[in-house]
């Protein structure tokens, strides 16, 4: 029987970590993820977990400690945000390239500079090619659920890759919502004990690893890493199926909200999906066939599945909470459009950059995007495909 609680996203994440009871947690505080290791350290002090909690002097050291723990055959977790993730950047590639299934709770925040402590997705998108599996969470419940599923995905012998669970800073991390927790024993059974077949620092299987990997082998090693990322798709669905049987909550690569008969749709991630659902409901009451595709699994990107879900539409808008500053489109937009192109599907698609630095995005603004899509669907004219939503113009 599930346990009804009222928790913030950070509290929910810390509770998930407590129930997982990893061997090692190494962390350095940074807003807005600070509360996760703070709450978890209380669990350690109270004897509710037997985790080795390592309070380090920087985020670089936090990831380094997790790498050392996983290399020694231990289950390791951490949490960070924004420039903390940036400081880990070097070690993120070492973690994935060494095939270490570390789990990271990433509370999304704008990357400096200028300094901003509020939410956008510039931190996550800055490491989208670092070889980490990336799951995004609309609300506190999903942040909790994704963390519970994370180890079973990352530690699968056909995957063995690190995984980050993303949630929106402050919007999700500090907002208190009703949430259904799973009983401790059920989580323990679901997550299981970490017993890797092989690990790098096994004294019974001594090897040299890490110092040098040149032309003779690196290409093949990176190919195997890419294959593991592709393998993760199947594993993510298998783990989600087990999770649904335990909780009744269903997860996939994405969520389709009133998309089956839709003519126009928005694609987005994280908490903005909740705002968009409210707009879709309102438009449906007006007789407008609007829908939503909420991406949950961003890495690996579900190319074929996203394309199939969007192929029947007359117009699509992709909302990005960061800007690539490349003149060609923001990250989610380029993934969606390249997916459709490679599958020979041509749906008029436009990009909206929104919410930079935590700027609120209102239902009125989301409704204006659907209004634009109606015009595109009617005329076939995309106009400027690279747009900004909620941007103040000079003098405003």
How should each PLM-predicted stretch be described?
Residues 1-126, 131-132, 148, 390-395:
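Thiamine diphosphate
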Residues 8-13, 241-264, 277:
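Glycine-/acidic-rich phosphate or pyrophosphate-binding loops and their flanking alpha/beta elements
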Residues 41-46, 278-292, 341-342:
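Short helix-loop-beta junction
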Residues 79-80, 103-107, 136-137, 164-168, ...:
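Short beta-strand segments
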Residues 118-162, 166-169, 345-359:
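Conserved thiamine diphosphate
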Residues 162-255:
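Conformationally flexible catalytic loops at phosphate/diphosphate-handling active centers
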Residues 259-288, 301-308:
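Redox- and metal-dependent alpha/beta enzyme cores, enriched for Fe-S-associated oxidoreductases
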Residues 320-396:
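Peripheral docking tails and interdomain loops at the edges
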